[in-house]
A protein has these predicted regions:
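N-terminal subdomain of nucleotide-sugar transferases
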Residues: 1-49, 83
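Conserved catalytic-core segment of nucleotide-activated headgroup transferases in glycan assembly
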Residues: 12, 170, 178-247, 251
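Donor nucleotide-sugar binding/catalytic pocket of nucleotide-sugar-dependent glycosyltransferases
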Residues: 110, 137-188
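Short N-terminal targeting/anchoring amphipathic segment
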Residues: 79-97, 108-110, 156
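Membrane-proximal helix-turn-helix segments that form the acceptor-binding/catalytic region
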Residues: 15-18, 78-82, 117-120, 128-157
């Protein structure tokens, strides 16, 4: 569900929709309801919006396909995709369950890669304390790495950074295009601030970002004289408590 746009992947999706709408591209949006409700603003930007329930069946953990993909295997999604012959943009590896479906062989298919998913899960694994969650992340990252082969069925792979572009271009030469993140800002405003400062921004409730923020607070802040701003949504209590110990950090 690409609204509200309050974290990385959703920011890119929502402002991509806005940008395409602004230049007259008609959009049929398919999205899964996963902790978010239907949003009227999407109806104003799209020709049609289809919503699907994501079924988090624990037995699907034992599938050879990644849990984040197989739980988006909805028959109505494929049925609706087959109503027309338009190009299809798959947002993220997790949305690619039907990418290799024979019924879509004649369609022009693009995949937007928001990251290297298995490497992201590797980071989650390193930052996780729970033994059960560690097992899950370790299992999933192996499946995600193998699952990348499905990208061979895409006509184009749209990467979000130079690092990702390099990685995917080695695996899928001639398919990859670097397309940087879509975001809210369409103008550059000069910063008249005379004093330098450091900014760290991210989702402050996920383990790897919590660790990064704590590292900045404990290891970097005591050694520098410039103000440090740590910004993001849902800050962990660990971050809040640590920042209180440092005069040069604000949240």
């Amino acid at each position: 569900m690409p609204y509200p746009p309050n974290y990385g992947g959703v920011i890119d999706v929502f402002y991509k929709i806005k940008s395409l709408h602004a230049i007259g591209i008609k959009i049929i949006l398919h999205c899964f309801k996963y902790g978010r409700e239907e949003q009227e603003i999407l109806n104003s930007l799209c020709e049609a919006v289809y919503y699907y329930e994501r079924k988090l069946n624990p037995t699907k953990l034992f599938s050879s396909k990644p849990f984040i993909s197989i739980t988006r295997n909805h028959p109505e999604l494929l049925k609706n995709l087959l109503k027309d012959g338009h190009p299809i943009l798959f947002e993220g590896l997790h949305s690619c369950f039907f990418l290799d479906n024979n019924a879509l062989n004649q369609r022009y298919k693009m995949v937007r890669m928001h990251n290297i998913e298995w490497q992201y899960y590797k980071g989650l694994l390193k930052g996780e304390k729970s033994f059960v969650k560690k097992l899950y992340f370790n299992w999933e990252l192996k499946k995600l790495k193998s699952y990348e082969s499905i990208l061979s069925k895409a006509d184009k792979i749209l990467t979000i950074s130079g690092k990702d572009q390099y990685y995917y271009n080695i695996r899928f030469p001639e398919k990859t295009i670097l397309l940087n993140c879509f975001h809210k800002n369409d103008t550059i405003r000069r910063n008249n601030e005379t004093k330098p400062f450091c900014l760290y921004h991210g989702n402050l409730s996920v383990p790897e970002n919590i660790q990064a923020a704590l590292y900045i607070a404990k290891k970097i802040a005591p050694k520098v004289n410039v103000p440090i701003i740590i910004a993001g949504k849902d800050p962990s209590k660990l971050i809040v408590d640590e920042i209180k110990k440092h005069k040069n950090i604000s949240l």
